[in-house]
Design a protein with these regions (language model features):
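Polar/charged, compositionally biased leader and regulatory segments
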Residues: 55-57, 61-63
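Bacterial N-terminal signal peptides that target proteins for export
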Residues: 1-12
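Sec/Tat signal peptide C-region and signal peptidase I cleavage site
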Residues: 22-26
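Mobile, glycine-rich extracellular loop/lid and propeptide segments
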Residues: 27-29, 34-35, 40-49, 63-67, ...
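Bacterial N-terminal signal peptides
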Residues: 10-21
């Protein structure tokens, strides 16, 4: 082993286990606050490397998303403290188990928006009662009628499942407080799992809610009225693309509105949600919609993309704004629509655009200087005049040891058409290579579109399997066929596919458990009002 890697491994292992031990000890102290594992849209928008983390060990305390992933990635298969039992056999992929559950909800998620999953205890086996997944629906609710914020527990149900035969509705609420109010961005969770924060989007305003749920309240067709705080943060503009980002260390949320402004809200989960004063809100891109923001807590910068094609950096202490041009605005596709991905240990930020005037691109920026480090080309994109939306990439497990050991994977298009392709790029040091290391046409259809990617390393499947989950919107079965699908990819070209009409929403992943049905993914269909759970291995 490289001595530098060995040092980094030992240093980070010490930090991870001390952090976990401190958390557990704190839970045994007087009147502790329970801390579980929230998994939402933001989990994979933070990158880090083990070698880099050894130089910034405080980040594992300040940014719980790092701790959650470190616990998953850097442990022995079948480790008891991390969901241990017996590793799954190599034949599990073809075991013939029945498909997991799906539920008709009466609403759906917007494209590239995510459910949120909560795991009650990271140091114990999965919990049938304590673990849940929640969906915020893009439809108005009715108290006593249709629900638009729905959660399920007994998640690990199905053939041979840990939690019996079927999932259970944990709660179902109508969160609509004004005519037409719905949830069109992704919800976020408190660390103890008792509260859910989200935006109610209206035609001309946006309301930030923090809801405290109670088990057993409401059903899918008999929604309960929730207990929640409400703050109208954008009184004159809607919010349709900018999901909230929570900084757990300061109990602060950052989020955007469709007028191109970014807002700061304090006291989110542990106090009273309050709009921060000057320099907030920060005007980023007047009249252009924003992506979800992502915080680099190491440098103190908030990164956000805009439909005008620019990547922006906000100094959270002063409100000072810096700009890097990534793509073009106008035409058939917005400039940037997926939230940036930020490496907090290597000081880099990644953003995707379907059109920079020449092609679709993945741009890597130096976060501190806001200069371009690298630009990878992803095919024609929307440069030919056809509407194309390109979403977030995902990074191989090797990247989290050292960027030079990993790759970035994502969808683009053909070089001279709009057929969906997958691309992979390696790294030299921390810098992305511009020459593709692997590319492959996914479908011959020019009408099918690709979703964003979610990566998950499961150490208990076949000795360690790096999964990539994404989807295609149509033509998965045959060109001209309407059916979309969700894909599980291992390696470069080993696919497992299952039908999801319209393709999947954003995808969240739960565990690396060996218990029955307890290593799964959660999503909704883009053209059908169903919530789905599939196993990671085999999409069953």
């Amino acid at each position: 082993m490289n001595p530098k890697h060995a040092y980094g491994a030992v240093a980070v292992w010490c930090v991870v286990f001390f952090a976990l031990g401190s958390s557990m000890s704190a839970q045994e102290a007087v009147a502790p606050t329970h801390t579980g594992v929230p998994q939402d849209w933001s989990e994979h928008h933070i990158l880090f490397s083990r070698d880099g983390l050894a130089l910034h060990p405080d980040l594992i305390y300040r940014e719980p998303r790092i701790l959650h992933q470190a616990m998953q990635r850097w442990q022995k298969p079948n480790s008891d403290v991390f969901r241990g039992a017996d590793p799954l056999p190599a034949s599990a992929h073809d075991s013939g188990q029945g498909r997991d559950w799906n539920v008709l909800l009466g609403g759906r998620l917007a494209p590239d928006m995510f459910p949120a999953k909560y795991s009650f205890n990271p140091a114990s086996p999965p919990s049938c009662s304590g673990d849940y997944v929640v969906f915020g629906l893009g439809t108005p609710g009715v108290t006593g009628g249709r629900a638009n914020l729905v959660a399920f527990n007994n998640l690990y149900a199905g053939t041979g499942g840990l939690c019996g035969a079927t999932e259970t509705v944990l709660f179902a609420y109508n969160i609509t407080t004004a005519t037409g109010g719905e949830i069109v961005t992704s919800p976020i969770l408190s660390e103890d799992g008792t509260k859910i924060a989200f935006v109610e989007s209206l035609g001309t305003s946006a309301i930030f809610h923090v809801l405290t749920w109670t088990a057993g309240q409401g059903t899918l067709t008999d929604a309960a009225a929730p207990t929640m705080t409400s703050l109208t943060y954008s009184p004159s503009f809607n919010s349709t693309t900018s999901s909230p980002w929570v900084d757990y260390g300061t109990d602060t949320v950052y989020l955007g509105a469709d007028n191109g402004e970014v807002y700061k809200i304090t006291g989110v989960f542990k106090g009273t949600p309050t709009l921060a004063g000057s320099p907030w809100p920060v005007t980023v891109s007047t009249s252009f919609r924003l992506t979800p923001p992502v915080l680099d807590s190491n440098l103190g910068y908030l990164m956000v993309g805009s439909a005008n094609g620019n990547l922006y950096r906000i100094n959270i202490a002063t409100g000072a704004l810096s700009t890097l041009v990534v793509g073009k605005s106008g035409g058939t596709s917005p400039g940037i629509i997926a939230g940036p991905i930020v490496d907090v240990t290597n000081g880099t930020t990644f953003a995707v655009s379907a059109n920079d005037g020449t092609s679709a691109v993945l741009v890597q920026a130096d976060t501190a200087s806001m200069t371009q480090l690298s630009k990878a080309r992803l095919g024609e994109g929307s440069t030919g005049g056809t509407a194309i939306q390109l979403y977030e990439p995902a990074f191989t497990n090797g990247y989290f040891t050292n960027p030079a050991d990993g790759d970035v994977r994502l969808c683009g298009t053909g070089a001279a058409d709009t057929t969906p392709w997958q691309y992979s790029f390696g790294f030299i040091g921390r810098t992305m290579r511009t020459t593709v290391s692997f590319s492959q046409q996914l479908l011959t259809s020019t009408a099918a579109r690709c979703t964003g990617w979610t990566e998950f390393f499961n150490p208990n499947i076949n000795g360690g399997t790096d999964f990539f989950f994404f989807g295609l919107t149509q033509d998965c079965t045959a060109t001209g066929a309407p059916g979309g699908c969700v894909e599980a990819l291992t390696g470069t070209s080993t696919f497992t596919t299952t039908t999801v009409d319209g393709g999947p929403s954003g995808i969240v992943v739960d565990n690396y458990s060996t218990a029955g049905q307890a290593s799964s993914i959660y999503l909704m269909g883009d053209k059908i009002d169903y919530a789905y759970k599939f196993t990671q291995n085999g999409l069953q």
